[in-house]
Amino acid sequence: MVQTRLDMGALKPIDDLMFRVMAQSKDFCEEVLRVLLEDPGLTVVECTPQSAVTNPHGRSAVLDALCELSGGGFVDVEVQRVDEGDLQRRARYYASLVTADRTGPGDRFEDVPDVCVAIVCEFDPFGAARSLYHMDRVLRETGEAGDNGLAEVYVNALARDGSEVAALMRLFVEGDAYDDARFPETSSEKRRLRETEVGRMAMGSVIEEIRAEGEAKGEAKGKLETICGFVRDGLVSVQDAAASAGVDADEIRRALAAQR
């Protein structure tokens, strides 16, 4: 128990576990987004940490924090400690999932919601020593800016360039850094989780949730592997296996294809 407390006390907002708990606070998310999106008047209506967006025919995703803004747009905030994978393609895919998930069957294209993906990195994603990077759409032939409602923002949490973004990111990556004057919500939530028993209990409950989720995924994976084995051996058809096990037939087919 002592070791667990020490470990949780060493966590920072850039860590997935602490961010997952801090993102339950709408005020924290609003404070962060006002800085990252450079909009002091921004208002967050709702924030959902670990928001699941599904693709019935392909890869789904669990977003670190999906925030709905007062103007009707959405911001997906991701924290990334390790430089792995293609961040730009990840941003594009996550934005497409949110767009599809929040657009109704009869909605007109002009009513498709604006979506922003903001990825906070504990490394410099583009190597230019900037605290903030914006990926914009530009009409190649004229140089004019285009706007299809998608925005991408990449944050270098290690930059120390004197900007407000850099000052906020110092709280994200340095354990003992606080700034109650400029970032009261971030500072108070961080202090609560790191230094109080109530905060440690909150993070401990999330750890238990994560452990339970992992066990459930393991059981589901084992069940699917068993079903695929029966189908490969010709003991049962895909449709019959799906019906008896309560598993989607397409999911079985995808698993079989992946095992070939």
Give the label of every model feature segment.
Residues M1-R260:
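Elongated, amphipathic alpha-helical interaction scaffolds
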